[in-house]
Amino acid sequence: MELFSDSGSIVENFKERINKLVFDYSLNHGGFRKTYKIQRDRVYYMLGDAHHANLSGKCLMLYNSEKDIFEGLGFKVKGSRINVSKTQILRNYEINFETIIGVEPNGLKTISTAKDVKKLYDIYSYKSSLHPFDDFMAHCINRWGMSIPASLERIIKSEIIKVRSGVLNRNSELYNYIPTVDASFSEMSRGPANVILTDGKLVPDGTCFGPILSKSVEDPRLKNEFRSKGLIMVHDYFILIGESPGPHYKKYTKMTKDNTIFWDPRRTDHKFNNVVSYFKKENIRDVVEYTTDALNRGLKPLVLIDIRKDKPKNLNTPEGAIEWERMVHDDNNLIIDMVNALDKRVTVCAKLRPAFMQVGSMRKLLRPVRILPLPYLRRSTAEFNMFVPNEALMNGNEIYDVTYDDLVRMSSEVFVLKNIIGGLYNMYLKDMHLNLGVVNKSVSLSDGSSAIWSLSNINNERISNFNFNNFLYAAPYSDFATSSVKRHFKGRNYSDWCLNILDEVNLKDGVYLVPLYAIVGGGQITSHDFVNAIITDQEQLIDFTQSERALSTQVVKLVSFILKDSFTAKGLNWTEIDNEIRNRRLSSLSGVGFTVTKMLDGKVLVDGKVVTVSGHMLYILLGSILGLPYGIKKYLKEIELNILKPGSSYERGVGGRVWHGLISHYLAVDCVIDVIDEYMVCTYEDRSKLNVVLRYVKSKLLELGSKYDVYLSVDERLVL
């Protein structure tokens, strides 16, 4: 007899089948379709039918009248892309938490307009030296698990040398046939395995996980928006200098006349404290005064600077060019004077431009900075974001010494990157700027925090106590005997602590384990959502009524069908085994004080009432033990709500009585014990752990019996 966790066991076969699930449908004939008398049954069997459709190499065939309800529960038409995933639903929900542990670019974009001040934490630090190409290469390897092909790397380095030496005019368009691209990561990471320069043209060959040949999109509005997007959400006092017109600031409802000073000679319609004048050196003391007052009031100031004089009319003459360079130089020194004058607790972002002629040296910085290329910047423009982090946002990548030569050299690298692999490079720059407000250190789950797959990494201590308030935690889910899992995704290996039903039974009241497929809020489902779960006290994400807001007891048939196939693979007939175990448990009642009578039609009377073993409890509990989560605490609450307000269910259709009584549910737990003991033998240690789960479920059922008399006397003969 195989052990529970043996390779090739029924349990492992069961879990493998979960990971192969696909939830597509087609309106074309030739798909997989069963016949049902009522539409409700088609919905109830939808997950099980999807499993069988997968096995047949087809997808479900639906009629137009059926597709809306299937799409509402997460199915998508075959060949279409996922518009919103369940993971995205969780990321969107993170805006409700003050502290977010482990960030992701799309999630940061979603919460960037939050009204409150966020605390963001992630251990990953974006490298930011004076060598943009090296920084990007390091990010590709460390964050994406991606290597830039050697042939492409050589060409990029060669072009950088040409630009620096003046052989190639920076104002030209490098390889103008390369398309401008702004797409998804998946689309921009299917690049050439090899690149050859032939007759002045880059010729790609083969495909690999790497950057595609592309130019970055140029968009001044988005450039300005992303420069500050990652910082506004972690600050609550703002001074904007030279930022007109700044239409993107209207997105932030937290920025008001009371906490935002807008300093620009051009009038705007912003409802801020507008100072309509040029910013001069003597105004630095005003900014120092404003920010000091804000700090004294416990606020977190952010100063954004985009000082730029108008270009001289004679710019195209030698005299005009020198005059412009001096103007740029003066602006840079004004910015540095302000940075040096401000308190170290003040965050500053200032646009910095190199002076290409010998007009002097920039003043020495007294605070550490990061010099960052800007996303969406014109490819031929040399401009940088000088990010001066407050003390909390420093991550060890800061520098003190920056020269014009450094900026010119950096601009050559950025120019080539944006013209050859600009699509992916621009995404990297966006992500880096979104992360500017993130504190790069490890923290623990706490009240008011969210940790979506960030604390589950095996390098962290496993969380076993979820005694928190207002929190959300996401992690992989597996069978009750497994505490960690290994997964491979996009070329990278992940090892994570996983959740299981043992974690769930130790949760305090009001805290629930919920599989991703069951969270409320829409979104399409994938197999990923059936092997991952959340633990939370956020009942807004949970549906306890088995409504059509989210998947629920459709999982019963999925577990049933997968079990049948897993047992068949071992030469066993699950249907016969299931029926035999249920009948045996019903018959066993006669020896413990009950009168059991079997009727001619096969129904069983217990003390004169028809009783069956609850298939819902059996499959929900067994599935959760084997690695397909439902949320046993969630299901127990669904049972209680049904007792309080008898109504409809997917299994029984419309009606008005309690689904099952105490005996029915209690026997189902015993049936689970029989299945495990007879066909999935556990080690002594694992069997002891399983006893904890089974005792918990039985105790909760007995509590319901002591609270509600109607739960003790359910007669399943009564028509629903």
Curated annotation (Swiss-Prot):
Subcellular location: Virion
Catalytic function, reaction form: a 5'-end diphospho-ribonucleoside in mRNA + GTP + H(+) = a 5'-end (5'-triphosphoguanosine)-ribonucleoside in mRNA + diphosphate; a 5'-end (5'-triphosphoguanosine)-ribonucleoside in mRNA + S-adenosyl-L-methionine = a 5'-end (N(7)-methyl 5'-triphosphoguanosine)-ribonucleoside in mRNA + S-adenosyl-L-homocysteine
InterPro entries registered for this protein in UniProt: Seadorna_VP3
Highest taxon of source: Viruses
Entry EC no(s): 2.7.7.50, 2.1.1.56
GO MF term list: ATP binding; GTP binding; mRNA 5'-cap (guanine-N7-)-methyltransferase activity; mRNA guanylyltransferase activity
Major subcellular site: virion
Keywords recorded for this protein, A-Z: ATP-binding, Capsid protein, GTP-binding, Methyltransferase, mRNA capping, mRNA processing, Multifunctional enzyme, Nucleotide-binding, S-adenosyl-L-methionine, Transferase, Virion
Function: Outer capsid protein involved in mRNA capping. Catalyzes the last 3 enzymatic activities for formation of the 5' cap structure on the viral plus-strand transcripts, namely the RNA guanylyltransferase, RNA-7N- and RNA-2'O-methyltransferase activities.
Name assigned to this protein: Viral guanylyltransferase VP3
Organism (species): Banna virus
Gene name linked to the record: Segment-3
